[in-house]
Design a protein with these regions (language model features):
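Short, compact, well-ordered microdomains
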Residues: 75-105
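Charged, acidic
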Residues: 67-76
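Small, basic N-terminal interaction modules of short regulatory proteins
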Residues: 1-63, 69, 94-105
Length: 105
């Protein structure tokens, strides 16, 4: 366990955060933050799905088989961004699960 210095105003405002102790409160803050990041990823993923009319796995297949012009700058950029959002979504889900396990058990 590590010790950290926290400003008094932060400690005072922790009263508004759900949790029975500081560890639970910090964990809840992290889950809340990860959930916001997850929502942003899912919104970005949805925009790509709406733009291309398919999910990322299907788009990847179309990209790999040449059904879409993989050398077009916009498509290549979209592929990389979409892939990044999918990876980030997975990391956020994993982090949320881990944090919730800490609260529950």
């Amino acid at each position: 366990m590590q010790t950290i210095n926290v400003a008094d105003t932060i400690i005072e405002n922790m009263a508004y955060i759900p949790g029975s102790n500081l560890d639970e409160k910090l964990t809840n803050l992290m889950v809340s933050n990860f959930s916001l990041q997850l929502r942003e990823c899912e919104e970005a993923i949805f925009r790509f799905e709406a733009k291309y009319g398919m999910g990322f796995a299907e788009f990847t297949n179309s990209f790999d088989t040449g059904e879409v012009d993989r050398y077009a700058h916009e498509i290549e950029r979209d592929f990389m961004e979409w892939e990044g959002f999918c990876d980030e979504r997975g990391r956020m889900l994993s982090s949320i699960r881990e944090m919730r396990r800490r609260i529950c058990c």
